[in-house]
Amino acid sequence: MCDECCFIHLGSVHLQGLMAIEQRSFASPWSEGDFLYLFAQDSALCVGLIHAEELVGYALGYCAARDFHLASLAVALEFRRRGFASRLLQQMLLRAKLRGAERCTLEVRAANRAARLLYDKTGFRAVDVRTAHYSGPRDDGIIMERSIEIL
């Protein structure tokens, strides 16, 4: 990882930076309330990536028994294609494994080719499709999973 990068635990103090990345990354962004709700959950994993003292990406999810669900992952537009999303994903899988998770699940828009390529490269496989699950624009949701017993 780059010398100027570190992972942090995210909380409400990071809300402004999270919202800035979220709103530029997704057609249907999470609200402040969505983030605050997740932060309050004991099962939540909320990790940010800091580069040169700036929040450049985040990954959010939660553990349920032996499963971890990756709920959201985003990198600021100007920091994409530098491997930050891969680093965030690996960090989340490691933290989930340390909490006892054996499997990771996620859902991704069918049209999000960059995210699907990332997940394919990191060992996820499509296991189901939620037809017309997303609106604005209408899109299918691809359910993906992978084992995290071995990283």
Language-model regions, residue ranges each:
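Conserved catalytic-core motifs of GNAT/GCN5-like acyltransferases
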Residues: 107, 125-143
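Conserved hydrophobic beta-strand within the GNAT/NAT acetyltransferase core sheet
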Residues: 70, 104-108
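Short glycine/proline-centered loop/turn elements that form peptide/ligand docking sites
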Residues: 89, 112-115, 132-137
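Short glycine-rich hinge loops at helix-strand junctions in the catalytic core
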Residues: 83, 123
